[in-house]
Amino acid sequence: MALYNVDGIVIRVRNFQDADKIVVLLTREEGKVEAVARGARRPRNRFAAATQLFSHVRAQLFSGRSLDTLSQVEIVESFRQLREDLVRMAYATYACELVDALLPERQRQEAPYLLLLTSLHLWGEPDRDPEPLLRAFELKLLSMLGFRPSLAACVGCGSEAVQQNGGVRFAPVLGGVLCPQCTDEGEGALRLSLGALETMKRLLDGDIRRAHMVRLSGELAAEIDRALSAYILARTERRLKSKEFLDTLRSAR
């Protein structure tokens, strides 16, 4: 079996056999990889702390036929502060599940790794609003993976999506906004106000470290949530449990 080294973030963990864990890492070098951590469910095991969700690690793995094996691991950043704050933990958990749902295994692409790592650090800062950061994360991740929504040109014909009555039609399945002539083609299309559209553009193209400066509240936040939730559902083809939990938390605040 070949050995290889990675910098990675734990994005999913599940129990395996009597005392092991299977961890999914989003890595800088290899993309998304899955490995077994022997004995990691035992409290004093050398892998126990490093295999918690969100952990940023440097790891050495054995490459196996069907499943790789964790050989050595060093914690770079535990992101303990995220696990100690229920709301911020919910945002970060959803981000990890979204990466896991959208990214195929072994697709070597550094950008999603760097995006998630930066976002985890930002969610860990208590003075930052986690909501606009999440929307920026979703939009940027989609764009990196080839799912960039069309927010200016009509996704049906390519012409400029002229606003009507202060908004445009957004077709989640087709992949973006529609011009008046193509509106009938967009099954399940949603209305987006001009404010929501411009906010999405700003979050998509702006620096994610400044996303917290975008104010999202009330109907504007609800509009963007409906649009992006439908857009992501059309690509994952399943509802993410962590998103449902996050929605429950937000509705109770």
UniProtKB/Swiss-Prot annotation:
Gene3D superfamilies: Nucleic acid-binding proteins (2.40.50.140), Recombination protein O, C-terminal domain (1.20.1440.120). InterPro entries: ARFGAP/RecO, DNA_rep/recomb_RecO_N, NA-bd_OB-fold, RecO, RecO_C. GO terms for biological process: DNA recombination; double-strand break repair. GO terms for cellular component: bacterial nucleoid. The keyword Cell wall biogenesis/degradation does not apply. Keywords: DNA damage, DNA recombination, DNA repair. The keyword DNA repair applies. Belongs to the RecO family. Involved in DNA repair and RecF pathway recombination. This is DNA repair protein RecO.
